[in-house]
């Protein structure tokens, strides 16, 4: 188990002793002997990650993944437009000692040490860096896949874990069309099904579909829209809470995550829903979360608990500033944690979410959030509060 950093206050240290939970506890039943509902619980680690070197700071942090070594990869937007030039990046602007944007790809270990940092546009490079980084996924062999949701971003890039360019998937700058087999439409998130040698694109901010490509080559394989329909970019996708959702994805199509048991979970963010499919696009079911949420929607990204059965889903809700703990069998919310705020354990637009092999959760925040947070797995506990804010030790609230 990873050593836990010394936290402020004796009570807080004592509360973290419970972190000595093992992987076996991840597979405890959902219902305790007392018939209390049981679910994974978490405490925020306020000292993770460690400060970045070189006066680096993060911009909008819009992707996170954990690789086979339990290294955490985050992608953020480090372009000048993401910051207040004089106030935030005075070193970059040449007017102050601090600060300057960090490279867009950041790799951390479990303790929060920065292991590597790379990426960004390079003059004369054989690739076109996304105008707006969006989403990151690390393959079992260490290859890093990166999406983009900027104006011309109709492609996905693949690099080695050290930032060496491998390939471009799709045609950069091509006209976007949800029925195209050669280009994509501002891909939001990327997920890998290594058992099938396939990669799923949540495609995306312009396109309204799930697209699947070959893991080894990037070759296009198949795609589908909401309910398994053929995508129609001209369809009415109006969403009205309490009424049936549109027959096409409203978008952005913000996640497409394959599970271990042969299902694919798709976030249709603007319609507050998660739709479940077979890998061939056959529709299975739909589940609505916080259906009164308008504006940017409630279903931003999901991660599975790391047990083999993936008993739980963790849903990032960037409009309501919280994380939902969902029983995957019933797709019911067991409880939520978080709220709006700047302190550890609170959120400003939680955008992406991932888990490591120990059961810990990692979240990123976009807009003015501009950070990544770690939530330490505390084992299975009875659900006594349905809405927790924030995830601090009880005696510190």
Identify the function of each model-found stretch.
Residues 1:
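Acidic, glycine/polar-enriched metal-coordinating patches/loops
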Residues 4-397:
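Eukaryotic scaffold repeat domains enriched in small/polar residues
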